[in-house]
Amino acid sequence: MLGDGNEGISTIPGFNQIQFEGFCRFIDQGLTEELYKFPKIEDTDQEIEFQLFVETYQLVEPLIKERDAVYESLTYSSELYVSAGLIWKNSRDMQEQTIFIGNIPLMNSLGTSIVNGIYRIVINQILQSPGIYYRSELDHNGISVYTGTIISDWGGRSELEIDRKARIWARVSRKQKISILVLSSAMGLNLREILENVCYPEIFLSFLSDKERKKIGSKENAILEFYQQFACVSGDPVFSESLCKELQKKFFQQRCELGRIGRRNMNRRLNLDIPQNNTFLLPRDILAAADHLIGLKFGMGALDDMNHLKNKRIRSVADLLQDQFGLALVRLENVVRGTICGAIRHKLIPTPQNLVTSTPLTTTYESFFGLHPLSQVLDRTNPLTQIVHGRKLSYLGPGGLTGRTASFRIRDIHPSHYGRICPIDTSEGINVGLIGSLAIHARIGHWGSLESPFYEISERSTGVRMLYLSPGRDEYYMVAAGNSLALNRDIQEEQVVPARYRQEFLTIAWEQVHLRSIFPFQYFSIGASLIPFIEHNDANRALMSSNMQRQAVPLSRSEKCIVGTGLERQAALDSGALAIAEREGRVVYTNTDKILLAGNGDILSIPLVIYQRSNKNTCMHQKLQVPRGKCIKKGQILADGAATVGGELALGKNVLVAYMPWEGYNSEDAVLISERLVYEDIYTSFHIRKYEIQTHVTSQGPEKVTNEIPHLEAHLLRNLDKNGIVMLGSWVETGDILVGKLTPQVVKESSYAPEDRLLRAILGIQVSTSKETCLKLPIGGRGRVIDVRWIQKRGGSSYNPETIRVYISQKREIKVGDKVAGRHGNKGIISKILPRQDMPYLQDGRSVDMVFNPLGVPSRMNVGQIFECSLGLAGSLLDRHYRIAPFDERYEQEASRKLVFSELYEASKQTANPWVFEPEYPGKSRIFDGRTGNPFEQPVIIGKPYILKLIHQVDDKIHGRSSGHYALVTQQPLRGRAKQGGQRVGEMEVWALEGFGVAHILQEMLTYKSDHIRARQEVLGTTIIGGTIPNPEDAPESFRLLVRELRSLALELNHFLVSEKNFQINRKEA
């Protein structure tokens, strides 16, 4: 809870609130809105009428639990039931039944849905808000051309433009444009009504020629002219009803439906008073837009900033789910209409239940969650990742932008983002600036705008009132920046503070301020606000840090950070990783998998997560924190989760670090570490991998799971039980059988081996006709079997095969090639693990755990790591933890440096270690070489920063290939570890080998090991029988491919081979 004095007090909102509120809004409002749109359906003879009674719909609570849905690959959904009636008009009889419409996937309290056993999350999308926008562009003559763009609710665009002669045109496509008079006339106005409803009738009359008068003489002529231009039809089309319907469908419905938000924006921009329920573009809108365009031409009015957030809207999870529900009801309407007609045709008596099927709704939502670009698999690497993922904002997706066409201006930070979209946290690469993150206090308003809270400062009232303002409203206030205001002291009236007014940043006196920010870093996202001393870092490095914190692996023994920002507890609470008491009571029983809580006369069982696999193969595990018999209050923490300690987020470890070069082993961001981190399991993490196999019913019979697998060595089957499935607790190595399976196959007599035929002829022994298709442990999968799941098929259909899943836990210590990072964008790869006696050591004898390169700090400008490093050392010596809000320079100049030095000085006094703070070089100390015992020449910065181990681990990346698959076209090895591929020797690698003069190695690289088919086969034969490998003679396959591709362009390329022996030239055909 945060406050300014005792007046303005606010709590940080729940980090999952955006997603959860959106889903609740869909259930409360969106469902009924779409159900009310469902029309009454009649048969062709209009004898039977079908309709839904929306008032009595109900959602049924799911029968399965979330955890079971994940393990059994099911969808955690609720069944939707609606009352429907079938009315016979002749007899006025009505049959009413409650029918099952379909399943709607539910959202849990963390803002995620479970679809087919997979956690999925729907990302909020930023779109251009429907309405009209005016802008100015220079033509090829350097003259300003003013245009007004009308954007519909579905994203369709139409433009109005004014030329040098003040003529106004409506551009309905890129090439075609028509007069504004023709468009208005086609929409139903005559010339007199047009002139009466505009402010500048003389300008409209000035470009009205005789030809133009003829076009707008009647509505039919105007529609024909409009259709001819819009559809690019040559000749003279004839007016008809079908022509009007086509025009209505292709133009007016797609480009003229403004929607609720568009109507509001249009009324505000053009000062209209058209009712909100009139959501289509009217002739009055067109004429008012044309008047405004003429005003701009003559210097009146203002242009629009398309990138301002007041001109954007958020398409939340509620809107997306409502759109899909409406689409499903349209499909259901078509099904019901066809079923009624079919029943009447076959003289059957229909009932509401017979007419309705649940397939449209269920399949629509399954395809939405599975295929829609804004529905993503939830990233569950660590608790922080889960809550950050749901707060993303994307410009991409249907109706949005693409990574290749978005301009720099759209990607850039805008002043209206203040307090709404984080200026730091975005993705790296092609989508930079297109995928952002919500600021901590931001919320989605009623009209789809992003709102940010402010404290109102009024002379009349002594209290402080909190307001949520949309992007367009806070422009007209003087807003004091929160990073310049103290949290717990009164602001002096004569103080001069930085403020924001109309997208400009000013410095004004305190009495001129209207609003103030409520929190020093309310304009940061969760990831960025977990970075201590972020104000001392370059923004690019802060961006990397906020991304890399989401890649941190939960460690087996987590540790709180000594230096933090204070948001660690809130992040852990909202992540769902903790087990929290839902009510008061007393703990009567505890176990590793559940807690029993007694209170209010009954007992509540709280299950715990035990060695659960995330979709990034990290281990999610809860550790009990309350003893048996303890009295618990509501909201108290019962168990810590993965990467949490004491209810706070704990992604890494506080380790002793020195910034110094060491024999070149930490150059170019490499990191030197001590073996203590390995042997004491400092950076040890557990990873759980899932392996699965299915049993099908083939045309030759069902596949069989058994432990009797012929022709396999016994030690590969040693871990199987009597059913042929690996036993729990077994230690398995690469190549071991996890599930024994035999697939039946038809074998001809001629395909039997001679010894098999002999056994059948003499002894009558039946030789196996099954093929071994066992599940084997792949390379790098060694570990302990912790769980086995046999999911039986439902309904007995061969399309629903049985699935056997085996979960194997791996213990991974830190090793050379793993990636580690700090919280300031300082990342590196482990280059060498030194014995602890060889590491540099301090004056008290402690050896350093990590050695970083000091050259990685000044050029990257992330000095915050130095402050954290030194303050962490003081905290470890004083046994203190610090929670520091960013921008502490609001209290005084050099506040961060003074805090660090004062804490180091105090630590030096209390521990009687003068080397902790030496006035000649504060923060540095003289340390000693562990190999020689001699001190290093220069004092070195030492400290205890918080270092994370990232998920980019060498065990998942290391790869070697001796033989493997080849591409069919180029005959070169495939690419990638998953395909057992090889490394490409490119042009620069060839130059390097040429520079060393290694001709034979270079020839091997370009022929045997690459795409020379004949040479590859000769190598294999020569290796088996022995002898010298012959040199390849003809051209490799890639050259032959080039010749064939040139032939497709009608270019013939002849090539010749020159013999090494007699220099004879032989022509070769490709």
Curated annotation (Swiss-Prot):
Keywords, in A-Z order: Chloroplast, DNA-directed RNA polymerase, Nucleotidyltransferase, Plastid, Transcription, Transferase
Residues annotated as transmembrane: none
One of the GO BP terms on file: DNA-templated transcription
Catalytic activity of the protein: RNA(n) + a ribonucleoside 5'-triphosphate = RNA(n+1) + diphosphate
EC numbers, comma separated: 2.7.7.6
GO cellular component: chloroplast; DNA-directed RNA polymerase complex; mitochondrion
Location in the cell: Plastid, Chloroplast
GO MF term set: DNA binding; DNA-directed RNA polymerase activity; ribonucleoside binding
Main location: plastid
InterPro entries: DNA-dir_RNA_pol_bsu_ext_1_sf, DNA-dir_RNA_pol_su2, DNA-dir_RNAP_su2_dom, DNA-dir_RNAP_su2_hyb_sf, RNA_pol_bsu_bac, RNA_pol_bsu_CS, RNA_pol_Rpb2_2, RNA_pol_Rpb2_2_sf
UniProt keyword Transferase, yes or no: yes
Assembly notes: In plastids the minimal PEP RNA polymerase catalytic core is composed of four subunits: alpha, beta, beta', and beta''. When a (nuclear-encoded) sigma factor is associated with the core the holoenzyme is formed, which can initiate transcription.
Function of the protein: DNA-dependent RNA polymerase catalyzes the transcription of DNA into RNA using the four ribonucleoside triphosphates as substrates.
PANTHER family in the cross-refs: DNA-DIRECTED RNA POLYMERASE I SUBUNIT 2
Family the entry assigns: Belongs to the RNA polymerase beta chain family.
Name of this protein: DNA-directed RNA polymerase subunit beta
